[in-house]
Amino acid sequence: MTENARTTPEAVRTVACVGAGVIGGGWVAHFLGRGYRVVAWDPAPDAESRLRGLVSSAWPALEELGPAEGASMANLRVVDTLAEAVADADFVQESAPERLDLKIDLLAEIDAATPEGVVIASSTSGYSMSEMQVGARTPGRLVVGHPFNPPYLVPLVEVVGGERSERWAVDWASDFYRAAGKSVITMERELPGFIGNRIQEAAWREALHMVAEGEATVEQIDLAMTSGPGLRWAFFGPCLTFHLAGGEGGMAHMLDHFGPSLKSPWTRLEAPELTAGLRDRMVAGTDEVVAGRSTAELIAQRDRRLIAVARALEEVERAEAAERAGADA
């Protein structure tokens, strides 16, 4: 909270959602599930019916997760104009289609209509805030708050400002998303595609190469991920996974021992040069994540979580099989 913000992140009560498609509607569902009042606007003629249908479809999942006190679909209000949507907002989430000209104009309109001191975030997945904030009169309060679909179930939000964004707005947005139950990465600089999408895109491109060359089928690729690294990445991520691959020597041993394999023809992506500086940054970063835990502790944690994920998937699969059997009876 700084003198520039109208309210503290924890005191937010009303969120304006501009754009009510798949991402915008997912945000609406998430904010409602967290107990906020949501005012939504979308220029499409059938926007309200589609939005309420999306929220209704998402609500059982939100109830299973455990909604916040006071959470209700009745807290959604859909209005006819952008000005109405943002008039009393404590925070604005923009989720318009991915067209740069549209984003520039819309963010300028939102900025002009939104009360002073209210942070405005864009859900963009493809543009930098530096590109989008050029038409705004007060660009300092504009940031990116990039979610993953569906926003009401996938917790990650990547927050980053543009060249004209002010630090207080980036920090305020990060704190607000955390208060709203999200897992937040506050990026220190703009990066095309952000972080999660770049990692995801690397795997996706390699999958396309393997299919194109007849090396693997779509089914094999998906099975390789869901029954292999995907299970571990659900809770440790690639860096901590490779740290454990180094045994007691951790990331340092893994890089020193297996570093040359980066030059092996296992991917079409060109590997970075494993310089001493890169090695040291990887080791130091991993040490921060490990935070003093021993390899034995990490292995025990990994195994518990693998078992929990496997059991949860088995339970869901049994329930789905029972539903199919009941439908066929």
UniProtKB/Swiss-Prot annotation:
Q: Can you tell me which residues bind NAD(+)?
A: G19, A20, G21, V22, I23, G24
An example of a GO molecular function for this protein is: carnitine 3-dehydrogenase activity
Q: Does the keyword NAD apply?
A: yes
GO annotation, biological process: carnitine metabolic process; catabolic process; fatty acid metabolic process
Matching entries from InterPro entries are given as: 3-OHacyl-CoA_DH_NAD-bd (IPR006176), 3HC_DH_C (IPR006108), 6-PGluconate_DH-like_C_sf (IPR008927), 6PGD_dom2 (IPR013328), L-carnitine_dehydrogenase (IPR026578), NAD(P)-bd_dom_sf (IPR036291)
Q: What GO cellular-component annotations does this UniProt entry give?
A: cytoplasm
Q: What is its main location?
A: cytoplasm
Asked if the Swiss-Prot or TrEMBL record annotates the protein with the keyword NAD, the reply is: yes
Keywords recorded for this protein, A-Z: Cytoplasm, NAD, Oxidoreductase
Catalytically driven reaction(s): carnitine + NAD(+) = 3-dehydrocarnitine + NADH + H(+)
Q: What Pfam families has UniProt attached to this entry?
A: 3HCDH, 3HCDH_N
Superkingdom of the source species: Bacteria
Localization per record: Cytoplasm
Q: Return the SUPFAM superfamilies for the record.
A: 6-phosphogluconate dehydrogenase C-terminal domain-like, NAD(P)-binding Rossmann-fold domains
The pathway this protein participates in, as annotated, is:
Amine and polyamine metabolism; carnitine metabolism
Cite the EC number: 1.1.1.108
Range of residues in the leader sequence: none
Cite the record's note on assembly: Homodimer.
Q: What is the protein's known function?
A: Catalyzes the NAD(+)-dependent oxidation of L-carnitine to 3-dehydrocarnitine.
- What PANTHER family has UniProt attached to this entry? 3-HYDROXYACYL-COA DEHYDROGENASE FAMILY PROTEIN (PTHR48075), 3-HYDROXYBUTYRYL-COA DEHYDROGENASE (PTHR48075:SF5)
* Family membership noted in the UniProt record: Belongs to the 3-hydroxyacyl-CoA dehydrogenase family. L-carnitine dehydrogenase subfamily.
Tell me what this protein is called. L-carnitine dehydrogenase
Q: What is the organism field in this record?
A: Nocardiopsis dassonvillei (strain ATCC 23218 / DSM 43111 / CIP 107115 / JCM 7437 / KCTC 9190 / NBRC 14626 / NCTC 10488 / NRRL B-5397 / IMRU 509) (Actinomadura dassonvillei)
**Lineage, highest ranks first:** Bacteria, Bacillati, Actinomycetota, Actinomycetes, Streptosporangiales
